């Protein structure tokens, strides 16, 4: 009996020693972490069976112990986010102006209101006609830069809509791009195809941007950024387009546009390329030009060829430059299974774009009609493109791209920082995550499960120690906002 007592005493002492060691370490056991309160968490869900499409739901707390843990750490920060959004093309603006006042207000609130809508805060504009416009025009159709003037179509459609949007959300940022220089500056003498005549028009071309920025400012619209040419290596015979080599772009920025913006005291940022990932070496060429580099804020990309993985080369070579996604269109070519397309957008485009240093994410047309237009007169390109909204009269249909952008815009504000987010445990490869710290201190988490099983996951905030256990359904996307 005495022997048994001694053995039991030794075992108890060892167990006490282990407990004391864990307590002294300052790290409580996982199950001892406090839970988030209901009023500290907001959740939006989209799932395969379409029961939920960016639907806000209460958190269904459970106390099951999970071996899968998502840890977010707001003390480790990465790049700043400039917003999520899309293109307000001439066609999009026209469709909004054709709506009744009440219907238009509701549609615009659904896009730009951070409380009632999805909180988009980044809009791309075309300087003159694009492939989705109500006419063929620039801001200086008559030869001579002294003839610069805001086009009547933009006075009628675009500018009133932009002012209405700013009244809804004053935090909107605008980036503007020409699809073509005025025809009199080009060797083709046309808005479609061709290139600039050469150095003889570089000064006027640079002044064209300065006058545009000043004209929009006079309307109460601040242009945060510009690119020199939409899809600089693409030439179309049926809609406005223009070829511009990397060397030419560097010359114009370094010797003409950059100095002019600085002289005029305009803080508008310059982004280069504005074309697909597969020709990222174009951006490298421009950035390596020392004369141009000092005026360049970053690079802009489209998602029609190549992959965002190449962006790691840019962030390594030029860590001080931003990276924008300025265009990606949805369309009839997408999978008929909407969740497959949503997972493609997230896993192949948005997540790797941001993980590799991207500062925003934008789709193309914010609105088109059910006939995939209106196209620019004479236009034959992208007849099956889809807008973020489909608008016919006062009828509005949010498309898949609306829910994609909403999963970001609902929880991430301009000025947020991407933060460290890690998966701990034997997570399936089908689960992807991304986390952010908002300027107001709230934390945002996106999680994607494109697998076939429900996963019980503990989500832990390292800054507060708080946690919640959540059942992540198969084939679903969630957006969490944590206070």
Listing of model-derived features with the role each one plays in the protein:
Residues 31-68, 174-176, 207-215, 219-224, ...:
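Substrate-binding and catalytic surfaces of secreted/luminal carbohydrate-active proteins
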Residues 54-223, 255:
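N-terminal catalytic cores of secreted or lumenal carbohydrate-active enzymes
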Residues 6-11:
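Sec-dependent N-terminal signal peptides
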Residues 16-17:
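C-terminal motif of bacterial Sec signal peptides marking the signal peptidase cleavage site
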Residues 24-32:
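Membrane-proximal, proline-rich intrinsically disordered regions
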Residues 1-5, 119:
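Positively charged n-region of N-terminal signal peptides that target proteins for export
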Residues 74-76, 85-92, 127-129, 178-180, ...:
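Short, flexible loop/turn elements at secondary-structure junctions
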């Amino acid at each position: 009996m005495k022997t048994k007592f001694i053995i039991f005493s030794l075992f108890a002492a060892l167990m006490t020693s282990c407990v004391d060691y864990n307590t002294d370490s300052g790290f409580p056991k996982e199950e001892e972490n406090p839970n988030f309160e209901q009023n500290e968490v907001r959740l939006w869900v989209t799932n395969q069976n379409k029961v939920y499409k960016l639907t806000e739901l209460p958190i269904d707390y459970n106390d099951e112990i999970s071996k899968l843990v998502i840890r977010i750490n707001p003390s480790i920060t990465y790049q700043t986010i400039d917003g999520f959004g899309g293109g307000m093309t001439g066609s999009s603006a026209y469709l909004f102006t054709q709506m009744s006042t009440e219907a238009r207000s509701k549609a615009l609130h659904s896009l730009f209101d951070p409380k009632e809508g999805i909180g988009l805060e980044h809009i791309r504009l075309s300087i003159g006609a694009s492939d989705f416009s109500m006419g063929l025009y620039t801001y200086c159709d008559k030869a001579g830069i002294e003839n610069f003037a805001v086009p009547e179509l933009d006075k009628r459609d675009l500018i009133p809509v932009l002012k209405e949007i700013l009244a809804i959300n004053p935090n909107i940022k605008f980036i503007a791009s020409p699809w073509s220089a005025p025809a009199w500056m080009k060797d083709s003498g046309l808005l479609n195809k061709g290139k600039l005549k050469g150095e003889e028009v570089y000064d006027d071309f640079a002044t064209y941007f300065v006058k545009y920025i000043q004209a929009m400012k006079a309307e109460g619209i601040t242009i945060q950024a510009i690119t020199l040419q939409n899809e600089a290596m693409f030439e179309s015979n049926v809609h406005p387009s223009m070829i511009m080599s990397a060397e030419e772009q560097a010359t114009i920025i370094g010797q003409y546009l950059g100095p002019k913006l600085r002289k005029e005291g305009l803080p508008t940022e310059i982004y280069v390329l504005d074309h697909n990932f597969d020709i990222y070496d174009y951006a490298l060429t421009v950035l390596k030009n020392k004369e141009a580099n000092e005026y360049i804020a970053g690079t802009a990309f489209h998602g029609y060829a190549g992959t965002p993985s190449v962006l790691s080369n840019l962030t390594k070579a030029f860590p001080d430059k931003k990276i924008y996604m300025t265009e990606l269109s949805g369309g009839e070519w997408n999978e008929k299974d909407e969740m497959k397309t949503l997972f493609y957008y997230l896993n192949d485009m948005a997540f790797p774009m941001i993980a590799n240093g991207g500062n925003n994410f934008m789709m193309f047309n914010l609105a088109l009609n059910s006939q995939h237009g209106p196209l620019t007169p004479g236009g034959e390109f992208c007849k099956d493109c889809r807008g973020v909204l489909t608008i016919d009269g006062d009828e509005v249909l949010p498309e898949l791209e609306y829910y994609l952008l909403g999963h970001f815009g609902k929880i991430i504000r301009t000025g947020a920082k991407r933060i460290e987010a890690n998966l701990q445990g034997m997570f399936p490869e089908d689960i992807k995550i991304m986390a952010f710290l908002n300027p107001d201190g709230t934390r945002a988490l996106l999680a994607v499960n494109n697998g076939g099983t429900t996963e019980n996951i503990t989500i832990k905030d390292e800054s507060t120690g708080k946690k919640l256990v959540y059942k992540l359904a198969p084939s679903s996307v969630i957006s969490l906002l944590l206070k």
